[in-house]
């Protein structure tokens, strides 16, 4: 793959990342698929940066500027602002669902109550899995 092809691919992937980040509304609970997409794209772009640093000519200042701008975007906008809010939202969702499940009367349950409880458990499982996925990203941050 030529340097130009690599830069073009990088630009495309970074644009996807920017779009995903700009679509986030942290005031609302984020759907799991949106969270996974964002972290996948962040990881993808960060990996591309590492590969590109090794493969692109050091004298190419436009490349270094793009990389620097991208690293700043990830660090200042995502890692410092968005990532902590996502972690907080996930933790709050887990707490809320857990409280809802604990408040359900464990005695005589109607079919509807049992179905609602099952849905809450499924949602709790999904969010807890997402939290583990996001924590892996968090671990990577602390290793940098």
PLM segments and residue spans:
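Long, low-complexity or tandemly repetitive, helically biased scaffold regions used
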Residues: 2-7, 11, 15-142
